[in-house]
C-alpha cells in the first residue's frame, strides 16, 4: 500500500503544480489584456484631444453624428486629419465646409457597385 500511496502523492503534487502554473499564466494574460486596454484608452484620449484642436465645433459635431453610422469612415478621417496636422499642412482649424469636402473625397474613393436587371 505504501507504493500506491507514494504514487498518489506524486500524482497529486504534479496536478497541483500544473494548476498553479495555469493560474499564473491566466493572471499574466489578464494583466497583459488590461495593459492593452489602458494603452488603447490613452490612444483614444490623445486622438480626441488632437481632433478637438484641429476641428471647429460644428465639424466635431458632424463627425460625432457620422461616427454613429460609419465608425470606420470617421476613424479613417480622424487619422488623416491628425497626420495632416502633424505634417503642418493644415492652416487653422478645419471648418464644417472643409470637412464636407473631405468626406466627399473619401466617399468618392469607394468602389461603387451597380446592379442592373434585365
From Swiss-Prot:
Keyword tRNA-binding: no
Gene Ontology annotations for the cellular component aspect, listed alphabetically: cytosol
Family, as annotated: Belongs to the PDCD5 family.
Protein's name according to its UniProt entry: DNA-binding protein Msm_0708
Top-level taxon of the source organism: Archaea
Pfam families: dsDNA_bind (PF01984)
InterPro entries, A to Z: DNA_bind_arc (IPR022889), PDCD5-like (IPR002836), PDCD5-like_sf (IPR036883)
UniProt keyword terms in alphabetical order: DNA-binding
